[in-house]
């Protein structure tokens, strides 16, 4: 799918939603709720908190949508909104003062059923070990790169990095993992992330 055409499509849906089209709101919800859950579940393991945060995202959109500025990227807007709501809820619940404290354990484990038959248990353990060595921001970066349609600029805004730094980090991460794991294992892993 052409990313530009997809963004254009969602901008049209957003325009229709702002004009009062409830089907457009439902389309936004249906398209993005699973992606938000997947992203949010890597930020927090508190399922009830995550479900409340996702609900708040859509309540806010529904309540304020007609007066909100049209986002350049709806997916970026939703991810950023969810992340902010989760931070706020975690801060209230645990009295965190800095978002970095909450993101120490961004979870980059995936259901690897698709590749388990293709690689050995040893390779799978090595892959998970290598992923666990990454800091939270790098794990989040890999997740966003392969599980979202965000541009490098949008990923950078979400992670407080400039786009060039994002590009370089993705390249370095993949080069490093490829060097440690080999092309075959890494390619299977990356394929599993996209599904």
Whereabouts are the PLM-identified features?
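Structural recognition of an alpha-helix C-terminal capping motif at a helix-to-coil junction
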Residues: 38, 52-59, 72-84
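Internal acidic/polar
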Residues: 96-120
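N-terminal module of bacterial RNA polymerase sigma factors
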Residues: 1-34, 195
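Sigma70-family region 2
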Residues: 18-19, 56-73, 92-93
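A short pre-motif secondary-structure segment
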Residues: 141-145
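Arg/Lys-rich amphipathic alpha helix in sigma70-family domain 2
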Residues: 66-70, 80-100
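C-terminal edge and immediately downstream basic/flexible tail or linker adjoining helix-turn-helix-like DNA-binding
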Residues: 2-5, 16, 174-195
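DNA-recognition helix of helix-turn-helix
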Residues: 83, 87, 153, 157-183
């Amino acid at each position: 799918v052409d990313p530009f055409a997809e963004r254009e499509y969602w901008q049209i849906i957003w325009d229709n939603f702002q004009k009062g089209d409830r089907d457009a709101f439902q389309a936004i919800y249906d398209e993005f709720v699973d992606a938000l859950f997947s992203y949010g579940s890597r930020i927090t393991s508190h399922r009830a908190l995550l479900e409340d945060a996702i609900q708040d995202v859509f309540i806010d959109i529904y309540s304020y949508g007609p007066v909100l500025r049209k986002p350049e990227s709806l997916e970026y807007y939703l991810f950023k909104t969810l992340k902010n709501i989760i931070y706020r809820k975690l801060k209230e619940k645990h009295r965190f003062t800095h978002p970095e404290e909450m993101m120490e354990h961004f979870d980059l484990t995936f259901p690897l059923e698709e590749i388990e038959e293709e690689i050995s248990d040893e390779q799978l353990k090595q892959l998970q070990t290598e992923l666990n060595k990454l800091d939270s921001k790098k794990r989040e970066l890999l997740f966003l790169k392969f599980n979202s349609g965000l541009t490098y600029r949008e990923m950078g805004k979400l992670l407080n990095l400039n786009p060039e730094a994002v590009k370089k980090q993705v390249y370095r991460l993949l080069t490093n993992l490829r060097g440690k794991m080999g092309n075959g294992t890494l390619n299977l892993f990356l394929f599993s992330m996209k599904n």
